Curated annotation (Swiss-Prot):
The gene is nuoB. NDH-1 is composed of 13 different subunits. Subunits NuoB, CD, E, F, and G constitute the peripheral sector of the complex. GO terms for cellular component: plasma membrane; respiratory chain complex I. The lineage of its organism: Bacteria, Pseudomonadati, Pseudomonadota, Gammaproteobacteria, Pseudomonadales. It comes from Pseudomonas fluorescens (strain SBW25). NDH-1 shuttles electrons from NADH, via FMN and iron-sulfur (Fe-S) centers, to quinones in the respiratory chain. The immediate electron acceptor for the enzyme in this species is believed to be ubiquinone. Couples the redox reaction to proton translocation (for every two electrons transferred, four hydrogen ions are translocated across the cytoplasmic membrane), and thus conserves the redox energy in a proton gradient. This is NADH-quinone oxidoreductase subunit B.
């Protein structure tokens, strides 16, 4: 599996975001996994256990921008029970949150505030873009709406829909957990170059393309 290695670039200008450089590398542990004797650091062996704890204890930051936030909060109710995935502990401060959900329309005036909140979150941190407006601006192709939050934030998971159902948000959370389980990052909080390895996760559209092309009998609107 290929990984995206992100390193902080200290010589980058201050107005560049994200401040860092990326390159595609192979799994740093792949060469050692199939050997009888493992020659490496103990922290590399513990990465799997630590990632398991991280992905099953994700604390979301409680804020929303528009109607998609209503669908997000619905996932916390009893019928959907987001506590099954360990993400029911909503935090009111970004300093205590693990991931941020951009749920709704992101206006240009709101973009610097969202970026400031993201910068206040401690590593490790992740971002879920929920809904068409957050993904690409949605129906608002106008000057006042940012055409996708990935213009100024590193997005880990995109959840399509206008608005997405709570089940779609839960599926996006599961995809984020899968991605976190394959990450390689330091086991402690450090300042500076962290050398974070993120797995290259193919999109669901690419994974299900052959299955959808093979469909010959389309359902009528009455059967949907």
């Amino acid at each position: 599996m290929q990984y995206n290695l992100t390193r902080i670039d200290p010589d980058a200008p201050n107005d560049q975001y994200p401040i860092g450089e990326r390159e595609t590398v192979s799994d740093p542990l792949e060469d050692q996994v199939h050997k009888n004797i493992y020659m490496g650091k103990l922290e590399d062996v513990l990465s799997g256990a630590v990632n398991w704890g991280r992905k099953n204890s994700l604390w979301p930051y409680n804020f929303g921008l528009s109607c998609c936030y209503v669908e997000m909060t619905t996932a916390f109710t009893a019928p959907h029970d987001i506590a099954r995935f360990g993400a029911e502990v909503i935090r009111a401060s970004p300093r205590q949150a693990d991931f941020m959900v951009i749920a709704g329309t992101c206006f240009i005036k709101m973009a610097p505030i969202i970026q400031r909140l993201y910068e206040q979150m401690l590593e490790p941190k992740w971002v879920i873009s929920m809904g068409s407006c957050a993904n690409s601006g949605g129906m608002y192709d106008i000057y006042s709406v940012v055409q996708g939050v990935d213009k100024f934030l590193p997005v880990d998971v995109y959840v399509p829909g206008c608005p997405p159902r709570p089940e779609a948000f839960l599926q996006g959370l599961m995809l984020l957990q899968e991605s976190i389980g394959k990450e390689r990052r330091p086991l402690s909080w450090v300042v500076g170059d962290q050398g974070v390895y993120r797995a290259e996760m193919p999109s669901q559209k690419e994974q299900r393309r052959e299955q959808r092309i093979a469909v010959t009998n389309l359902r009528s609107p009455d059967e949907v």
